[in-house]
Amino acid sequence: IAYLICELDATVEVLSYDKENGTFTNLDKIALTTEDQQAWGGAIHLTRDGRFVYASNRGFDALYTFSVDATNGLLTLVQTVDSYGSVPRDFHLSNDEAYIVVGHQESDNLTLFKRDLETGQLTLLQKDFYAPEVVCVVPQ
């Protein structure tokens, strides 16, 4: 299974991979907005345990939490939260995966969320850390 975020139509696609043929098959396509909203996909990350996928929407300034079905890899929306900035270009999970840091390209700030390891849900901790024109977030 692979998870793909599409920038121009702000969708997340769930793909299965056939190792024999070297091909992908689209299993699902999830819109991150309604048709009348302008949106651009940003970043996407899968937790190490494979239980949650997180995606950002740069046009709608939001983060999406999806749970992963362990049997087929399909996604279910768990939560949508405001990213508390403009154009959440990138985000990253901390090494212990207890936190997510979001970098905003237009509002020049980082947002810090605490992540519930059981439910995947995010809680805002800080939204006003100055960081000019962020395009990538890499934890140490």
Region locations from a protein language model:
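Beta-rich, blade/repeat-based domains predominating
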Residues: I1, T33-G50, Y84-Y99, A131-Q140
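Acidic, glycine-rich loop-and-beta core segments that form the ion-binding/anion-interacting portion
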Residues: I1-I30
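Conserved beta-strand positions in repeat-built beta-propeller and related beta-rich domains
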Residues: L4-L8, A55-R58, V102-Q105
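A detector of repeated loop/turn-to-beta-strand junctions in beta-rich toroidal repeat architectures
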Residues: D9-T11, F60-A62, L75, S107-N109, ...
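Short loop/turn segments immediately following beta-strands, especially the blade-tip
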Residues: L15-T23, F66-G73, K114-Q121
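A short beta-strand motif characteristic of beta-propeller blades
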Residues: L27-E35, T76-D82, T123-D128
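C-terminal hydrophobic structural anchor segments
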Residues: Y64-F113
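Blade-level signature of beta-propeller repeat domains, shared across WD40, Kelch, NHL, RCC1
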Residues: Q105-K114, T123-Q140
